[in-house]
């Protein structure tokens, strides 16, 4: 990636997922390390909050609220597996409010955005001629966003992620808080399907520092 944004393609993850699925999985003789959340932790701002609760699986519950638009309030929960990710999440497109487009472009973002790769909402109207892929595509895309943010931990997580009007910055702060105290989590081994090296040394109290994995 040579810029601040990855190629938008169709605005969802499906055009990244399909080639990976087609390529298949190569089994390796290395254990799969997981991070299990052991305590409830939360971060918030004036607009929303995100938190982790202990769980034996990875589960996400996301709620959004866009008053005075056709988005409105939406809530979606999902136990994340390979199958549910492909079936329920990966094809949900990004979206924006029409009134925000000019501001984003002035800041150098969404320069390639169009009705072919984003849902544009103008009040109670969806500007895309073909409409939505699902009636709750908005909240599902927010869950897709969150799952991508959580992947920056560097290894699969076991826990229940819950969000109310959260976003990328809050998700980053939640990961920072999770790894700031070793009593918040436990590293466990799950098998030998895919090797993951867990790296958390780069987590700091600053929300400008992001996690890394090798």
Segments predicted by a language model, with ranges:
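C-terminal regulatory domains involved in ligand/effector binding and gene-expression control
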Residues: 1-214
């Amino acid at each position: 990636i040579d810029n601040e944004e990855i190629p938008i393609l169709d605005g969802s993850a499906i055009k990244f997922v399909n080639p990976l699925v087609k390529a298949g999985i190569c089994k390796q003789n290395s254990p799969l390390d997981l991070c299990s959340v052991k305590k409830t932790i939360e971060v918030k701002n004036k607009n929303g909050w995100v938190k982790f609760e202990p769980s034996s699986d990875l589960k996400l519950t996301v709620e959004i609220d866009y008053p005075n638009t056709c988005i409105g309030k939406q809530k979606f929960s999902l136990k994340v597996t390979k199958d549910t990710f492909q079936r329920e999440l990966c094809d949900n497109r990004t979206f924006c409010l029409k009134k925000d487009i000019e501001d984003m472009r002035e800041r150098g973002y969404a320069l390639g955005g169009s009705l072919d790769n984003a849902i544009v909402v103008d009040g109670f109207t969806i500007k895309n001629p073909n409409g939505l892929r699902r009636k709750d595509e908005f909240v599902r895309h927010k869950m897709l966003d969150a799952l991508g943010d959580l992947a920056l931990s560097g290894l699969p997580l076991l826990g229940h992620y819950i969000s109310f009007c959260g976003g990328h910055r809050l998700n980053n702060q939640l990961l920072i808080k999770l790894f700031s105290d070793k009593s918040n989590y436990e590293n466990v081994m799950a098998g030998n399907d895919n090797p993951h090296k867990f790296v958390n040394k780069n987590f700091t109290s600053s929300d400008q520092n992001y996690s890394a994995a090798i």
